[in-house]
């Protein structure tokens, strides 16, 4: 059986922010929601859950961000798609947390993701070497996942050969467990905790949810 976690009992995490943000029109990491950048918001939500946080910025040449978290480039430059970021996350985790069996990934554009994300994904591992993936409302959220570091070499060769590089297709190659997260009950109705903010209009909607949520802890 593989260790479910790092030595601290918490896993390392990587925020996936290496996309083009073409629908938003400007980098989503720097977009403001409730007066805070999306990156700061995601880091704030993730910090109590994990052992360490790095940020995948695709072609970024490395170094630290203003928040002090390391920025990591894709390990295979020029291959589009989020799996390039997942691979970079696996390689990074192997370096910074040699005892860890998995790395958690969280995309930059889902500002209300659960505060129990890491604990519930880790707790769902059965044998210990599976991918644990978040679901809500009957839909898979494949970038909210705990990835076993042992499958990094398989991902490395698979993304070089499979042109579509679909995240779901890669998950289907391996043992996985699904973890269902409930909607968040608010006075204004149910909120999908994985609400995705890709466009300026969705950003406005997220701002409205934030105002409604002011009194309710999520
Ligand atoms: N490293 C890396 N990450 C990516 C790439 N494309 C998408 N991602 C990440 O995958 C996640 C989901 O992708 P999208 O929601 O489509 O984000 P996006 O590609 O920035 O936005 P669009 O250009 O509007 O599709 C985001 O967290 C991105 O940062 C890529 O080419 N390389
Ligand atoms: Mg998105």
Curated annotation (Swiss-Prot):
Q: Which gene encodes it?
A: mobA
Question: Can you tell me which residues bind Mg(2+)?
Answer: 109
Q: NCBIfam families from the xrefs?
A: molyb_mobA (TIGR02665)
Coiled-coil region(s): none
PANTHER family referenced in this protein's UniProt entry, alphabetically: MOLYBDENUM COFACTOR GUANYLYLTRANSFERASE
Indicate the quaternary assembly.
Answer: Monomer.
Q: Which InterPro entries match?
A: MobA-like_NTP_Trfase, Molybde_CF_guanTrfase, Nucleotide-diphossugar_trans
Stated name of the protein: Molybdenum cofactor guanylyltransferase
Q: What is known of its domains?
A: The N-terminal domain determines nucleotide recognition and specific binding, while the C-terminal domain determines the specific binding to the target protein.
Q: What class of enzyme is it?
A: transferase
The protein's superkingdom reads Bacteria
- Identify which cofactors the protein needs according to its UniProt entry: Mg(2+)
Q: Which family does it belong to?
A: Belongs to the MobA family.
């Amino acid at each position: 059986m593989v260790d479910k976690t790092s030595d601290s009992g918490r896993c390392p995490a990587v925020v996936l922010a290496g996309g083009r943000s073409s629908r938003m029109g400007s980098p989503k990491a720097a977009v403001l929601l409730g007066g805070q950048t999306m990156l700061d918001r995601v880091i704030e939500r993730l910090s109590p859950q994990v052992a360490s946080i790095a940020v995948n910025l695709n072609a970024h040449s490395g170094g630290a961000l203003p928040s002090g978290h390391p920025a990591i480039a894709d390990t295979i430059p020029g291959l589009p798609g989020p799996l390039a970021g997942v691979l970079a996350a696996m390689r990074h985790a192997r370096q910074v947390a040699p005892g860890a069996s998995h790395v958690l990934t969280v995309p930059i554009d889902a500002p209300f993701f659960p505060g129990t994300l890491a604990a519930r994904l880790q707790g769902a591992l059965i044998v210990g070497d599976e991918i644990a993936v978040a679901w809500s409302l009957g839909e898979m959220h494949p970038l909210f996942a705990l990835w076993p570091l042992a499958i990094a070499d398989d991902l490395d060769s698979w993304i070089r050969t499979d042109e579509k590089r679909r995240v779901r297709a890669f998950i289907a190659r391996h043992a996985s467990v699904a973890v269902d997260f409930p909607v968040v009950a608010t006075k204004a109705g149910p909120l999908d905790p994985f609400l995705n903010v890709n466009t300026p209009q969705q950003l406005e909607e997220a701002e409205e949810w934030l105002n409604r949520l002011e009194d309710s802890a999520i």
